Amino acid sequence: MSTPTEFTFTDYQPYDFANRRHIGPSPSEMADMLKVIGYSSLDKLIDATLPPSIRQKAPLVWGAPMTEREALDKLRETANKNKVLVSLIGQGYYGTITPPVIQRTILENPAWYTAYTPYQPEISQGRLEALLNYQTMICDLTGLDVANASLLDEATAAAEGMAMAERVAKSKAKAFFVDADCHPQTIALIKTRAEPLGWSVIVGNPFTDLDPVDVFGAIFQYPGTHGHIHDFTGLIARLHQTGAIAVVAADPLALTLLKSPGEMGADIAIGCSQRFGVPVGYGGPHAAYMAVKDAYKRSMPGRLVGVSVDARGNRAYRLSLQTREQHIRREKATSNICTAQVLLAVMASMYAVFHGPQGLKAIAQQVHQKAVLMAKGLEKLGYTIEQETFFDTITVEVGHMQGLILRAAVAEGVNLRKVGETKIGMSLDERTRPATLEAVWRAFGGNFRLADFEPGYRLPKTLLRTSEYLTHPIFHMNRAESEMTRYIRRLSDRDLALDRSMIPLGSCTMKLNATAEMLPISWPEFSDIHPFVPTDQALGYREMIDDLTEKLCAVTGYDAFSMQPNSGAQGEYAGLLTIRNYHIANGEGHRDICLIPTSAHGTNPASAQMAGMKVVVIKVSDDGDIDMADFRAKAEQYAANLSCCMITYPSTHGVFEETVKEICDLVHKHGGQVYLDGANMNAMVGLSRPGDIGSDVSHLNLHKTFCIPHGGGGPGMGPIGVKAHLAEHLPGHPETDGRPGAVSAAAFGSASILPISWSYCLMMGGEGLTQATKVAILNANYIAARLKGAYDVLYKSKTGRVAHECIIDTRPLVDSAGVTVDDVAKRLIDCGFHAPTMSWPVAGTLMIEPTESETKAELDRFCAAMLAIREEARAIEEGRMDKTDNPLKNAPHTVEDLVGEWNRPYSREQACFPPGAFRVDKYWSPVNRVDNVYGDRNLVCSCPPVESYAEAAE
């Protein structure tokens, strides 16, 4: 053994987050990958991939990147600028206790937060069961037949309820009535949604101002935003007499004590499950809900989990009735909903599973008792409570003392709600302590102790709940934390998420969600801030939002951003409204034509329809590019009424089109604006800026490019960036600037997940973000090169390159071997992979996006699996495998297959351990291939009875 003669310092940087943590391939691996593709350097590959005309001139620079520790210290310093007071503001946002077992094993568990929307049901059985629990919970509490698997927030759910009411109502009226006791943000968003569609909104007292003949529907708040509790049974009956639809916005915790909307006759119930264990988080994310009568289930927006069977007849879950949705029906869809709030819906469902009906009822009773005690103290001080009966919210007339009392309460560490100029409101919740009540009494001039008052109740006797809820055994069998932990673990083990393997979904950007980025979302300085606190209590949030806005402007070339949209589809909608408002301000409100290529995301035409625009479809040429002849012809044909075009860049076919600047110029020439969908921004950051190539507005999917996890189908964020001339038309909000145009319940959308994107930017720096883009392009081109010969890559640039994703053609296998794209996708499950995006944008193909976070080893494992699948298809072609009884047709294979009677013409080894599959750590699909047709024909969208669990297995 030799003895070193001197100590030599290494140049290895162990805390280089971009290159040592986030980016998968090492420098030596990149060199090997480049050789396979045929390039000597990464920069030469990038030069060959991006047209010179779209390259940005200056590098992305904003200071040195931070280490994980430095970034966390910066986040902590920023978080400490927020003041965490006790907020009794209410208005749809309430203090809640997240059970630690749920925080630790779901919210902070990558097995749950890194999963994708469960389009592949076989590898999503765990979260599908959790979502079915959620739907069952909502159906039980609302007294309605079918509930969806979550919506974005209560205000957007109300707007969706209005839109659904208009679709299904027999009334031909074009007005919608809104209870003045709805939350202000709900009223604002309903107005935003109604105006482009030509519907008028009537706001008033439903008992004096509602004439059912004049409306296609009405929405009532239950309990009201100021605490009133009314029985709407009579009003709902009157609405039904005229063919109108009744929507009730209901607090699910209150429904454990109060008569359900279904028992009143409501057609639709909407609301938010935030107070079921999900922190307020300065406005989100939270899971809203919608439940409807059975007759209207096919008109309901959003994801719907149903019960089906697999190939063995065993019970299996899947997304049902997908033909309602934007990815299939486009502008004719029930909604533009894409991202929902799955992670938060799972948390809320587990809150109900953990507490059970007795626990939920006890929590509700305790909340109500606190409100009664608060009222008694204020009454003893001589104040009058506006409501005789209430659940958790009271409103007090204080006259000219309003400002003094509000300031005194803040000095006591409590935020109360300003109601008009002479009233104060307060909403009690699960976290309200005796000290809080005593502090509020002091702010009102009293010096009472809680023991001075006797508990009581002030719920309306005629509206007390008598019906049962949460009767299914799942809500009774997991009270002990040991059992709860094991139940959550069992469900997560059924799913395939990023913590197990790469998820190469094209156009979805399933990249690393680093632990250091995730940590701050649980800090109380971020999670416990009410969205409507005074600005000086959220200075940390504002500082972070301002800095992130500045960074996103630098990345995109835009001049302003709105963080309000809480999904990519909402970003599209907000961007199109911004364009619409710009035209109206210029006296050109007649401009309503939106040009959209056939290859666009389904959300594009759905969003355009919601924004009151008419969609004109543009052809796509054989090479995947926009057909310029058709584009020119349509732009000229509709020039007088052209509002905008919507394009995705790089294209949805995975190529940087060289005509993008010409497209932008052509639209501007005819008076329109350019909406560039930011879904594929992961191929542009640091290399090209939408604002430089002629785009006027884009949304960015922070849950793609900027590392917010997909959460199994949400949360997401879709902030929009605009050029300067559109900035004044960005969404407003009643609680901030008072301007119209709100598109989300909270002014900054799902603000509590913004620390993820901000810390990603801080740790990567401009240079790291640029390198990430380059490696994303490298990884996609490497896969395309590795699969060459086995599969055709459908679309390439003139230089033979793809962008950050590639489309491989599996259609020839149908004719040669009877192998469909479904067969390939299900066989990948046996290999331990989530399938790439199937049949979009081209039917019968797979779109692969590996992202920059995947190592060469993982890319090689995926390629080995895909090549092995091609060889299995070849064996069928050559007659060496049976055409109908083979590993592809029978995939995925389960443990039940392995241990059961085996009479197949291939071995168990071939079935269960194909190339790419791990042996020791193999992922086993919990079910065989799910029967989609059975699930839609025999629709069951709530937990099946226990007996059926056994029946399905027979």
From Swiss-Prot:
Gene3D superfamilies per record: Aspartate Aminotransferase, domain 1 (3.90.1150.10), Type I PLP-dependent aspartate aminotransferase-like (Major domain) (3.40.640.10)
A Pfam family cross-referenced in the UniProt record is: GDC-P
Q: Which CDD domains match?
A: GDC-P (cd00613)
* Recorded GO CC terms: cytosol; glycine cleavage complex
Does this UniProt record's set of keywords contain Oxidoreductase? yes
Q: Does the keyword Nucleotidyltransferase apply?
A: no
Alphabetical keyword list = Oxidoreductase, Pyridoxal phosphate
What InterPro entries does the record point to?
Answer: GcvP, GDC-P_C, GDC-P_N, GDC_P, PyrdxlP-dep_Trfase, PyrdxlP-dep_Trfase_major, PyrdxlP-dep_Trfase_small
What Enzyme Commission number(s) appear in the record? 1.4.4.2
Co-factor(s): pyridoxal 5'-phosphate
**At the top level of its lineage, which domain of life is listed?**
Bacteria
Residues with PTM N6-(pyridoxal phosphate)lysine: 704
Q: Name one GO biological process term.
A: glycine decarboxylation via glycine cleavage system
The GO terms this record gives for MF are: glycine binding; glycine dehydrogenase (decarboxylating) activity; pyridoxal phosphate binding
SUPFAM superfamilies for this protein: PLP-dependent transferases
**Record field: catalytic activity:** N(6)-[(R)-lipoyl]-L-lysyl-[glycine-cleavage complex H protein] + glycine + H(+) = N(6)-[(R)-S(8)-aminomethyldihydrolipoyl]-L-lysyl-[glycine-cleavage complex H protein] + CO2
Family from the record: Belongs to the GcvP family.
- Quote the HAMAP family the UniProt record gives: GcvP
What PANTHER family does the entry give?
GLYCINE DEHYDROGENASE (DECARBOXYLATING), MITOCHONDRIAL, GLYCINE DEHYDROGENASE, DECARBOXYLATING
Q: What does this protein do?
A: The glycine cleavage system catalyzes the degradation of glycine. The P protein binds the alpha-amino group of glycine through its pyridoxal phosphate cofactor; CO(2) is released and the remaining methylamine moiety is then transferred to the lipoamide cofactor of the H protein.
The annotated subunit structure for this chain is:
The glycine cleavage system is composed of four proteins: P, T, L and H.
Question: Which protein are we looking at?
Answer: Glycine dehydrogenase (decarboxylating)
